[in-house]
Amino acid sequence: MDKFVKLTGVAAPLPVVNIDTDMIIPKDYLKTIKRTGLGTGLFAEARYNEDGTPNPDFVLNKPAYQNAKILVAGDNFGCGSSREHAPWALLDFGIRCVISTSFADIFYNNCFKNGILPIVVSQEDLDKLMDDASRGSNAILTVDLEAQEITGPDGGSIKFEVDAFKRHCLLNGLDDIGLTLEKGGSIDNYEKATAASRPWA
C-alpha cells in the first residue's frame, strides 16, 4: 500500500448527500476481485449516458476535474452495502482523499485499509472546501496528514482529527499484511520461545 503523507491536487466538488456504494460503483462491476480497472466504473450511472458516452455534466468528466485526487462530498458518504469495491474504484481513478461531514462506518474503515484518507469536517468547513473545489483547475488543496491540516488555494487552513493508529498505518503505507510483517521480529521470537518451552508440540 502506498504511503499517504502529504497530498496536493485538484479537488472535485460533489455536493450530494447519501452517496451510497451502489452509486460509487454499480453492481455490474462487482464480478471481479481485482483492484485495478474499477476506475472506469466509478460513479458509472451518473458519469455515462445510456449509450455509454461520457456525460459532460458530471463533475469528473469536466476537463478541470478529470485528474482529481481529492473528492469533497455531501453528508453520509459511502452508505449502503459494504462493498470494498467502492474504495478500490476511487483509488483506481486516482482519488486518495475524500472529505465530508460524515461517512458510513464500514466504508470509512475500508478507505484506510486501501490507502485512502477519509476526512470528517464540520458543515461550515465543508462549505468552504466545496467553494474552493468549485474553482475548476484552480481548485488545488493540500492535505497534510502529518500536520492533520487541509490548506486551500488562498492559503487558509482547516485542521482535522484522525485516529492515531489509522494515521500511523497511512503514513507508513501499512495494510493488514504490512502490519503483520511489521511485527515479524516479535512473531519469530514468540515462535522460538514456544518451540523451546513445548518441544513436544
Swiss-Prot record:
GO terms for cellular component: 3-isopropylmalate dehydratase complex. Pathway: Amino-acid biosynthesis; L-leucine biosynthesis; L-leucine from 3-methyl-2-oxobutanoate: step 2/4. It is an enzyme of class 4 (lyase). The keyword Cytoplasm does not apply. The keyword Lyase applies. One of its GO terms (biological process) is L-leucine biosynthetic process. It holds the Pfam family Aconitase_C. PANTHER family: 3-ISOPROPYLMALATE DEHYDRATASE SMALL SUBUNIT, 3-ISOPROPYLMALATE DEHYDRATASE SMALL SUBUNIT 2-RELATED-RELATED. Heterodimer of LeuC and LeuD. This is 3-isopropylmalate dehydratase small subunit. It comes from Rhizobium meliloti (strain 1021) (Ensifer meliloti).
